[in-house]
A protein has these predicted regions:
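Conserved alpha/beta enzyme-core scaffold
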Residues: 1-240
Length: 240
Protein backbone atom coordinates (compact mmCIF):
# COMPACT_ATOMS: atom_id res chain seq x y z
CA UNK A 1 0.00 0.00 0.00
CA UNK A 2 1.41 3.36 -1.05
CA UNK A 3 1.23 5.73 1.93
CA UNK A 4 2.90 8.74 0.33
CA UNK A 5 1.15 12.12 0.21
CA UNK A 6 2.02 15.08 -1.98
CA UNK A 7 1.90 18.04 0.41
CA UNK A 8 2.07 18.96 4.10
CA UNK A 9 -1.50 20.25 3.82
CA UNK A 10 -2.75 16.88 2.60
CA UNK A 11 -0.82 15.09 5.34
CA UNK A 12 -2.47 16.96 8.23
CA UNK A 13 -5.92 17.47 6.67
CA UNK A 14 -7.59 14.82 8.83
CA UNK A 15 -6.60 16.25 12.23
CA UNK A 16 -9.72 17.50 13.98
CA UNK A 17 -10.69 19.68 16.91
CA UNK A 18 -9.90 18.30 20.35
CA UNK A 19 -7.29 15.84 19.09
CA UNK A 20 -4.43 14.58 21.24
CA UNK A 21 -1.22 15.00 19.23
CA UNK A 22 2.16 13.47 19.92
CA UNK A 23 4.81 15.53 18.15
CA UNK A 24 8.32 14.14 17.78
CA UNK A 25 11.40 16.07 18.75
CA UNK A 26 13.82 16.45 21.63
CA UNK A 27 14.17 20.19 21.93
CA UNK A 28 14.55 21.04 18.26
CA UNK A 29 16.19 17.76 17.24
CA UNK A 30 13.83 15.76 15.08
CA UNK A 31 11.05 18.36 15.09
CA UNK A 32 8.67 17.94 12.10
CA UNK A 33 8.53 21.68 11.41
CA UNK A 34 6.93 21.52 7.96
CA UNK A 35 4.02 19.38 9.15
CA UNK A 36 3.47 21.46 12.27
CA UNK A 37 3.48 24.71 10.31
CA UNK A 38 1.02 23.24 7.80
CA UNK A 39 -1.30 22.59 10.73
CA UNK A 40 -0.89 26.19 11.91
CA UNK A 41 -1.57 27.40 8.35
CA UNK A 42 -4.83 25.47 8.35
CA UNK A 43 -5.85 26.93 11.70
CA UNK A 44 -5.08 30.48 10.57
CA UNK A 45 -7.13 29.96 7.41
CA UNK A 46 -10.09 28.04 8.85
CA UNK A 47 -10.04 28.25 12.65
CA UNK A 48 -9.53 24.49 12.87
CA UNK A 49 -8.15 22.38 14.46
CA UNK A 50 -8.45 23.87 17.92
CA UNK A 51 -8.61 22.68 21.56
CA UNK A 52 -5.60 20.44 20.96
CA UNK A 53 -3.57 18.53 23.53
CA UNK A 54 0.12 18.27 22.58
CA UNK A 55 2.54 15.68 23.95
CA UNK A 56 6.23 16.49 23.53
CA UNK A 57 9.41 16.60 25.56
CA UNK A 58 9.11 20.38 25.90
CA UNK A 59 6.54 23.14 25.39
CA UNK A 60 8.01 24.78 22.32
CA UNK A 61 10.86 27.16 21.69
CA UNK A 62 10.90 30.65 20.20
CA UNK A 63 8.00 31.33 17.84
CA UNK A 64 8.21 28.28 15.57
CA UNK A 65 6.99 24.69 15.63
CA UNK A 66 4.96 23.83 18.72
CA UNK A 67 5.51 27.37 20.01
CA UNK A 68 3.75 28.66 16.88
CA UNK A 69 0.79 26.39 17.64
CA UNK A 70 0.64 27.74 21.19
CA UNK A 71 1.01 31.32 19.96
CA UNK A 72 -1.91 30.84 17.57
CA UNK A 73 -4.18 29.61 20.38
CA UNK A 74 -4.63 26.09 19.01
CA UNK A 75 -3.32 24.27 22.09
CA UNK A 76 -5.26 24.07 25.36
CA UNK A 77 -3.07 21.51 27.13
CA UNK A 78 0.60 20.52 27.11
CA UNK A 79 1.93 17.22 28.40
CA UNK A 80 5.70 17.55 28.67
CA UNK A 81 8.82 17.30 30.83
CA UNK A 82 10.41 20.69 30.19
CA UNK A 83 7.93 23.57 29.82
CA UNK A 84 10.77 26.10 30.02
CA UNK A 85 13.14 25.87 27.06
CA UNK A 86 15.85 28.36 26.08
CA UNK A 87 13.12 30.67 24.73
CA UNK A 88 9.80 29.63 26.30
CA UNK A 89 7.94 32.88 25.68
CA UNK A 90 4.94 31.41 23.82
CA UNK A 91 4.06 28.85 26.48
CA UNK A 92 4.91 31.20 29.35
CA UNK A 93 2.62 33.94 28.04
CA UNK A 94 -0.33 31.58 27.57
CA UNK A 95 0.23 29.81 30.89
CA UNK A 96 0.40 33.03 32.90
CA UNK A 97 -2.80 34.15 31.17
CA UNK A 98 -4.49 30.83 32.16
CA UNK A 99 -5.02 30.02 28.49
CA UNK A 100 -3.21 26.68 28.53
CA UNK A 101 -2.97 23.79 31.01
CA UNK A 102 0.17 21.84 31.84
CA UNK A 103 0.68 18.23 32.84
CA UNK A 104 4.30 17.97 33.98
CA UNK A 105 5.74 14.47 33.58
CA UNK A 106 9.30 13.35 34.41
CA UNK A 107 11.12 12.58 31.18
CA UNK A 108 11.66 8.87 31.79
CA UNK A 109 8.07 8.46 32.90
CA UNK A 110 6.88 10.32 29.80
CA UNK A 111 8.76 7.94 27.53
CA UNK A 112 7.52 4.90 29.43
CA UNK A 113 3.90 6.07 29.40
CA UNK A 114 4.11 6.44 25.62
CA UNK A 115 5.83 3.06 25.27
CA UNK A 116 3.22 1.42 27.48
CA UNK A 117 0.42 2.64 25.23
CA UNK A 118 2.11 1.17 22.19
CA UNK A 119 2.60 -2.14 24.00
CA UNK A 120 -0.99 -2.28 25.26
CA UNK A 121 -0.05 -1.88 28.94
CA UNK A 122 -2.67 0.33 30.68
CA UNK A 123 -0.58 1.09 33.78
CA UNK A 124 2.78 0.48 35.43
CA UNK A 125 4.63 1.39 38.63
CA UNK A 126 7.69 3.62 39.00
CA UNK A 127 9.55 5.03 42.02
CA UNK A 128 9.95 8.32 40.18
CA UNK A 129 7.96 11.21 41.71
CA UNK A 130 6.98 9.32 44.88
CA UNK A 131 6.55 11.78 47.74
CA UNK A 132 6.31 14.81 45.43
CA UNK A 133 3.45 16.91 44.09
CA UNK A 134 3.63 14.99 40.82
CA UNK A 135 2.41 11.86 42.62
CA UNK A 136 -0.60 13.47 44.31
CA UNK A 137 -3.82 11.58 43.67
CA UNK A 138 -2.08 8.59 42.08
CA UNK A 139 -2.20 5.05 43.49
CA UNK A 140 0.89 3.98 45.44
CA UNK A 141 2.02 0.40 46.07
CA UNK A 142 4.92 -1.13 47.97
CA UNK A 143 7.19 -3.72 46.39
CA UNK A 144 10.09 -5.24 48.34
CA UNK A 145 9.89 -2.47 50.90
CA UNK A 146 9.97 0.39 48.38
CA UNK A 147 7.13 2.74 47.39
CA UNK A 148 6.09 3.01 43.76
CA UNK A 149 3.67 5.34 41.99
CA UNK A 150 1.18 4.03 39.43
CA UNK A 151 1.31 5.77 36.06
CA UNK A 152 -1.19 5.32 33.23
CA UNK A 153 -0.40 4.78 29.58
CA UNK A 154 -0.40 7.84 27.33
CA UNK A 155 -2.31 7.43 24.07
CA UNK A 156 -2.80 9.86 21.20
CA UNK A 157 -5.10 10.33 18.26
CA UNK A 158 -2.27 11.38 15.95
CA UNK A 159 1.54 11.27 15.99
CA UNK A 160 3.45 13.76 13.84
CA UNK A 161 7.11 12.88 13.45
CA UNK A 162 10.26 13.37 11.38
CA UNK A 163 12.28 10.51 9.88
CA UNK A 164 15.43 10.29 7.79
CA UNK A 165 14.39 7.64 5.24
CA UNK A 166 10.98 6.18 4.51
CA UNK A 167 9.70 3.85 1.86
CA UNK A 168 6.28 4.06 0.28
CA UNK A 169 4.99 1.43 2.72
CA UNK A 170 5.92 3.58 5.72
CA UNK A 171 9.02 1.77 6.97
CA UNK A 172 11.27 4.34 8.67
CA UNK A 173 14.85 5.05 9.69
CA UNK A 174 16.06 8.00 11.76
CA UNK A 175 19.16 10.15 11.97
CA UNK A 176 21.00 10.20 15.29
CA UNK A 177 19.21 12.12 18.08
CA UNK A 178 16.35 13.01 15.74
CA UNK A 179 15.00 9.55 16.57
CA UNK A 180 14.14 10.41 20.22
CA UNK A 181 10.49 9.60 21.12
CA UNK A 182 9.32 9.15 17.52
CA UNK A 183 9.24 5.33 17.25
CA UNK A 184 7.29 5.08 20.51
CA UNK A 185 4.85 7.78 19.42
CA UNK A 186 4.05 5.96 16.18
CA UNK A 187 3.05 2.91 18.21
CA UNK A 188 1.00 4.88 20.76
CA UNK A 189 -1.10 6.87 18.27
CA UNK A 190 -4.12 5.88 16.24
CA UNK A 191 -2.70 7.63 13.16
CA UNK A 192 0.95 8.43 12.42
CA UNK A 193 1.99 11.13 9.95
CA UNK A 194 5.64 11.29 8.90
CA UNK A 195 7.86 13.72 7.05
CA UNK A 196 11.06 12.12 5.77
CA UNK A 197 14.12 13.60 4.11
CA UNK A 198 13.89 10.97 1.38
CA UNK A 199 11.21 8.51 0.30
CA UNK A 200 12.49 5.41 -1.46
CA UNK A 201 10.91 2.42 -3.15
CA UNK A 202 9.81 -0.56 -1.04
CA UNK A 203 12.76 -2.88 -0.54
CA UNK A 204 15.40 -0.15 -0.79
CA UNK A 205 15.79 0.04 3.00
CA UNK A 206 17.65 -2.88 4.53
CA UNK A 207 15.12 -4.59 6.83
CA UNK A 208 17.81 -4.69 9.52
CA UNK A 209 17.90 -0.88 9.46
CA UNK A 210 14.15 -0.33 9.83
CA UNK A 211 13.33 1.20 13.22
CA UNK A 212 9.61 1.87 12.76
CA UNK A 213 7.76 -0.76 10.68
CA UNK A 214 5.25 0.53 8.18
CA UNK A 215 2.33 -1.04 10.04
CA UNK A 216 2.57 1.88 12.49
CA UNK A 217 2.62 4.58 9.79
CA UNK A 218 -0.33 6.01 7.86
CA UNK A 219 1.06 8.88 5.75
CA UNK A 220 4.54 9.75 4.47
CA UNK A 221 5.65 13.08 3.00
CA UNK A 222 9.05 13.69 1.41
CA UNK A 223 10.73 16.90 2.62
CA UNK A 224 14.21 16.90 1.02
CA UNK A 225 15.53 19.99 2.82
CA UNK A 226 13.70 20.15 6.15
CA UNK A 227 13.81 23.22 8.33
CA UNK A 228 15.88 22.88 11.49
CA UNK A 229 13.99 24.25 14.47
CA UNK A 230 17.11 25.17 16.46
CA UNK A 231 18.44 27.24 13.56
CA UNK A 232 15.13 29.09 13.31
CA UNK A 233 15.11 29.80 17.04
CA UNK A 234 18.71 31.01 17.10
CA UNK A 235 18.08 33.34 14.16
CA UNK A 236 15.01 34.79 15.87
CA UNK A 237 12.67 33.74 13.07
CA UNK A 238 8.96 33.38 13.74
CA UNK A 239 6.25 31.37 12.04
CA UNK A 240 5.31 33.47 8.98
Amino acid sequence: MDKTVSSPEQAVAGIGNGAVLMIGGFGGSGAPVELVHALVDRYVATGSPTDLTVVNNNAGNGRVGIAAMIDAGMVVRMVCSFPRSSDPRAFTEKYLASEIDLELVPQGTLAERIRAAGAGIPAFYTPTSYGTELAEGKPVAEFDGKKYVQERWLQADVAIIKAELADAHGNLTYRHAARNFSPLMCMAAGVSIVQARKVVAPGDIDPEHVVTPGIFVDAVLEVPEPLQEEELVRSGEAYR
